[in-house]
Amino acid sequence: MRAGVVAPHRLLPGLVALRRFAAERFPPWATAPMAALLYAAPASLGRPGPLEAAGGALATFLGLLCLRIADDLEDLGHDRLFHPRRGLCFGRIDPARLRDASLALVTALVVLESTSMWRLGFFLGACAFYRAWYGSGRARVHAVVRPFLSNLVFPCAVLHGAGPAAWRASVPLALYAWLVAVAHEFAHNVRSVEEDRSFGPGYARALGTRGTAVLSAALFTGATVAALLLWQMLGRPPAFGTAIAAAGAGLGFFLARLLREPGSRHAGALYRAGILFGLTPALGLLLPR
């Protein structure tokens, strides 16, 4: 059996592992709509046909699932210490079988994406990047730089959805998606230096608690500027502008609380507000303009 090809008799156990993993770590009821939105919003700028749109949304969902699997398999040693109740950590999900399922998904994605050379190019490029990232790249990069590289999947997903006809118009949205994802990562990990030293990613050790909060706020501010650029490019549609203003005001409230009192107490609320803020431009693009 060639490397990278999953034997048929290993597929069924792999599918069981995949189903259990998705239910726990990538619940379709939440992730499928988000993946569809991540594809449909930039795709709306290029107006693809229904079949192409459905294939692109499915590919986005499966691609993000593969990335979630790769991330959890890479962090398995860490998670066994700090998240022992997860299925991968206590044996309910077999890592080898989950890896088999992931390889099968990658094969299916190559077939699915081959209908568009644009999308196939982005998919293969992402595979090459994340293979290098998980292989040795992540360990060589400073902790504060890691979120900027690990979250490149989001601007790539936007450009993947926009297609060759609309990628220029989608650049502000791609920048927005990237900055929000990175800001979200820092906001989620605003904690004390002691907490960070025990189980954190190293942001507080490098920047301090307040420094991590300030960087998160600066990135969210940059994302707001990118959203305003997109609004300008679209011809200033009122509904889109109103949605951005409302989401930005809500996020600003939680950012102010975090900056006033940095720490995990307010980081959770900002994390949830950041999700809504991150989805707003994508939802706004689907409104009548």
Question: How would you describe each model-predicted region?
Answer:
Residues A35-S44, A104-L112, F123-R131, N151-V158, ...:
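Hydrophobic core of alpha-helical transmembrane segments in multi-pass integral membrane proteins
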Residues V5, L12-R19, A128-R131, S136-A139, ...:
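Extended hydrophobic alpha-helices typical of membrane-associated regions
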Residues P33-A40, C89-R92, A143-P164, A204-T209, ...:
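Small-residue-rich segments of transmembrane alpha-helices in multi-pass membrane proteins
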Residues A40-L58, T107-R119, F154-L175, L228-A239, ...:
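Helix-coil boundary and interhelical linker segments in multi-pass alpha-helical membrane proteins
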Residues L37-A70, F82, G121-F122, A128, ...:
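Membrane-embedded alpha-helical segments that form the functional core of polytopic membrane enzymes
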